[in-house]
Amino acid sequence: WILSSHSHSAPILCPIDLYDGFSPYFAGLKDRIICLITNLMSQLQPVTIHFGQSNCDFNVNRRLVDTNGNCRMAPNIDGVVDKSVPVISCRDINNSLVGILFSYCCHPTILLGPKISGDYPGWAQNSLEKKHEPVVALFLPGVFGNVRPYFGSGDRFRPGTESDVISCGYELANAVEEGLKDSYHVPTEVIQAWRIKPQLPLDKPLSMEELGKIASQSIASQSENDSTNSWKNGFNIARR
């Protein structure tokens, strides 16, 4: 499996939406990753694992329901959102930092193309790696189904800019730094992993009329917040 921290300004890796095949970029990326892993297997070293956590505040729930029950794409300050920033770090036998894995619950959708970008996670990674060179910093996408970046106090989302990417990236990197400061050693014998598949009860299915209304609201609210041309540009460059 290859886990990618997605953005709306990077090449498409797998079949999605209107693009129905794996991109040439994916094939080359897969080969490079396999080569990288093979080389790293010969450079394994003992490390200690540490865990810390802090918070970051630029994410917001993106579904606002009005008094009539209509839902639209808009900042919902009181909506459900997770602002925590969990941080796992690795240190070598000299207690020197060698790796950082951090997570945050927010869609990396500040930029929409046509420029290729790692969005705020990429900027946060670069910031951390420059400060702690030669550390490798990795981003793990959090549970951000209806959460996106928010830059102001208005009742609509405005298009993001490169300055917003830098600002949010630095803010997240600073939160990771706080998590590193407050981290504690985790004995390897207590580390566990498990997988569960909870069965959730289903409500009565919506009618086609109700689904059509929801779809119309979604399209209308999306048009209010994002540039159609930006989406088309990002889609076209991703196909290449």
What do the PLM-derived regions correspond to, one by one?
Residues W1-R240:
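Non-catalytic substrate/cofactor recognition surfaces at enzyme active-site rims
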